[in-house]
């Protein structure tokens, strides 16, 4: 082995570039060892100021102790070769076919991949290597305190699998519930319990004349059914136009509508206006528990069900006859009895809600919309003379009329319906029947006959402002036939008044 001075000269950077080309490989290999010592001694072992160790060596972590093992290629960037003892031969370090080229001026020798097995292996520990070659930075102990949190999480990861899985299932259930809540909207249920078609309110003829609540309510229903203000396609009509169609003459303020306006009168006026505009419709009593034309077999719950369904139907309109007044139901609300059911999911039973009926008012002396309990309306309709209940003044309670008549009640709910079926034209009827009807104008059973023109003298017509035109009598036979056909097809036979009074 060459001495230290020769090795120092051989490895000196200033002279390494002028190394003789005919130097033997053994001498070159031996000269690489001091070079390694020099580079190793100059390499900083202690960590840098930032607390990190040199990045040229790979780091391997274990649970007990963390080492950084420098492999045989760890210092290739420093171009050094490592060997265990100086007695290694060329055949041990280099393969037979390995030789230095004549033009190679570098001072470093390439080492095959099998050199690591010769330098150190699993049987040679780090202590033997350090005693033979001095203290080398091949391995050092690293402070692993900064990795404790990570290793702790890794250690307990397998133990928390079930807990994490249960948490995931819980979160999935919450997420599914939230998605269902997002898809579900209480608006649909609220719309079923709170119904108010603003078009019905738009069509309320307000204000009315002094006693024209009947014709004002009728025009409100007709405009909703047939005009563009409601569900139809015709121009809306006014009270004055309707009164002119019915034969009344101004001044309308002087007409006393009360004595000749009844339930069947409104039905007949409805048919006359329909005939004038060539539209189809029918009318019938929805609920009248007492008196003439009462709806036998109809119950309050059944009437409520029909009324609420009809208020959702744009082909139906209603008039409520109360104490000395007519006005139009336009909506309702089914209020839950319990507070926690305000936005309940799904429909509620009739026992869980209380119904309020919204009623449009034509008189300017009262609120535009009344809101009355259905129970109070039922009480009003079920009272009989001389007892009565004024639905617009519930604070007065049950009252008694000064009358000798006992029993019966005129109060009721009347329905008006727009029909889509086509009635037979004039040419479809057998002319002999029409001629016979015109020659023998008899009262046909099933036709409502209330305070009609047939029962009112010409003198009374003049006093009431009624225009008793000849066209009314000319059209009477046709109207009788049309009314018969209309009632037979619609199936409503509930509003007969044989006494001619309502």
Swiss-Prot record:
What's the protein name?
Basic immunoglobulin-like variable motif-containing protein
Q: Which UniProt keywords apply?
A: Cytoplasm, Nucleus
TM spans, by residue? Answer: none
| Locations listed in the record | Cytoplasm; Nucleus
- Species of origin: Mus musculus
CC per GO annotation = cytoplasm; nucleus
Write out the biased-composition intervals (Basic and acidic residues): 12-26
Identify the stretch(es) annotated as Disordered. 1-32, 438-460
Instruction: Give the family from UniProt.
Output: Belongs to the BIVM family.
